[in-house]
Amino acid sequence: MVDLKRLRQEPEVFHRAIREKGVALDLEALLALDQEVQELKKRLQEVQTERNQVAKRVPKAPPEEKEALIARGRALGEEAKRLEEALREKEAQLEALLLQVPLPPWPGAPVGGEEANREIKRVGSPPEFSFPPLDHVALMEKNGWWEPRISQVSGSRSYALKGDLALYELALLRFAMDFMARRGFLPMTLPSYAREKAFLGTGHFPAYRDQVWAIAETDLYLTGTAEVVLNALHSGEILPYEALPLRYAGYAPAFRSEAGSFGKDVRGLMRVHQFHKVEQYVLTEASLEASDRAFQELLENAEEILRLLELPYRLVEVATGDMGPGKWRQVDVEVYLPSEGRYRETHSCSALLDWQARRANLRYRDPEGRVRYAYTLNNTALATPRILAMLLENHQLQDGRVRVPKALVPYMGKEVLEPCG
């Protein structure tokens, strides 16, 4: 959510943000509704003031005036009730619209849709094989590393790993948590579900509600990232300045409906309904300098993880129309997938300034004693099984086995993934 005061003072800034981010929102209608709310508040205050004045006059009024004053007080009470009901309705409408207002993006963001995304860095080179390489599905089938019957049990976009590959997935998650702990982040294991308020706080609702599964007969929804829970942990609190920045590494199984992705990545591990994710989350003081420092830290963490996994990757500056309504800046990290001959996203590093904090009521007391909204940031540390597809394809050997990166050998106790059986 944006600062309503700033929205009133600089509507042209938000008109541009709406246009550049491709948000379907009538800002003039929102501002007109805001004016209605202000006028209703003013009129309600006037009515309440007059009603109080009338109530004070009644006990001292002469008999011939008392009945009229009582009638006037009753009429003012009825008018106040009508105004309060109208105000509640208009404020609810205004809040629903304010939830849709995008945060203006940083000046360095390319303007446009996905086609305007710009590569800003490339590390490592795609592998060169002396043999015909296999894709990750063929490698799993050759080595007996996945269970094809799982679709009969759990439907499409499900997966079940076996043998060394099952252990490899678990090793990767522990590796990521250990890495984040060494970087000073607090490791946390978290639930995979939350109430609607938490999704509103991150901005997943209302914009991405179709990607979220509701748990029947409850007020809970399955999360697609630990960010949802982490962002809600301190909702309503006023944190001491000395506690900032908060730096969390949250692990939770994640779920996405993949609505709208019909026909995309239907084979293998690239797009599944349930996956596992270690998420980086930072809450900082409200300054661009602090946010920029945290952004670079989150990005460097992701890069170092990929270097340790010995994977070729690139960084992409995400354009305004592709970054989402709440983002100030977003840089995607993409890893090379040999079977497709292109880079695929594995991480999204995002700075959201106070957009989430206003929605989730995340505040702190600054050194001058003022209560302010914090800034939030997040980035993936590691998500499986997508990263497994990259590891299998980039590290495959001629005999179909797969090499284990040096950083993972202590976790696996071996240098090569062996076939099942």
UniProtKB/Swiss-Prot annotation:
- What are the alphabetically sorted keywords of the record? Aminoacyl-tRNA synthetase, ATP-binding, Cytoplasm, Ligase, Nucleotide-binding, Protein biosynthesis
Keyword check for Phosphoprotein, yes or no.
no
Checking InterPro entries in the record gives: aa-tRNA-synt_IIb, aa-tRNA-synth_II, aa-tRNA-synth_II/BPL/LPL, Ser-tRNA-ligase_type_1, Ser-tRNA-synth_1_N, SerRS_1_N_sf, SerRS_core, tRNA-bd_arm
- Keyword presence, Cell cycle: no
**Any one cellular-component term (Gene Ontology):** cytoplasm
Using the UniProt record, give the first listed, main subcellular location: cytoplasm
Alphabetized Pfam families for the sequence:
Seryl_tRNA_N, tRNA-synt_2b
The record's Gene Ontology biological-process terms are: selenocysteine biosynthetic process; seryl-tRNA aminoacylation
Query: Could you tell me the EC number(s) of this protein?
Result: 6.1.1.11
Q: Where does ATP bind?
A: R256, S257, E258, V272, E345, T346, H347, S348
User: Reaction(s) catalyzed by this protein?
Assistant: tRNA(Ser) + L-serine + ATP = L-seryl-tRNA(Ser) + AMP + diphosphate + H(+); tRNA(Sec) + L-serine + ATP = L-seryl-tRNA(Sec) + AMP + diphosphate + H(+)
> Which positions in this protein are listed as binding L-serine?
T225, A226, E227, E279, T380
The pathway is: Aminoacyl-tRNA biosynthesis; selenocysteinyl-tRNA(Sec) biosynthesis; L-seryl-tRNA(Sec) from L-serine and tRNA(Sec): step 1/1
Localization per record: Cytoplasm
Named from the GO MF annotations, one term is:
serine-tRNA ligase activity
Q: What does this protein do?
A: Catalyzes the attachment of serine to tRNA(Ser). Is also able to aminoacylate tRNA(Sec) with serine, to form the misacylated tRNA L-seryl-tRNA(Sec), which will be further converted into selenocysteinyl-tRNA(Sec).
Show the HAMAP family listed in the entry.
Ser_tRNA_synth_type1
Relay the domain remarks.
Consists of two distinct domains, a catalytic core and a N-terminal extension that is involved in tRNA binding.
* Family (UniProt): Belongs to the class-II aminoacyl-tRNA synthetase family. Type-1 seryl-tRNA synthetase subfamily.
Subunit architecture = Homodimer. The tRNA molecule binds across the dimer.
NCBIfam families according to UniProt:
serS
Q: What is this protein called?
A: Serine--tRNA ligase
Q: Which organism is it from?
A: Thermus thermophilus (strain ATCC 27634 / DSM 579 / HB8)
Gene name of this polypeptide:
serS
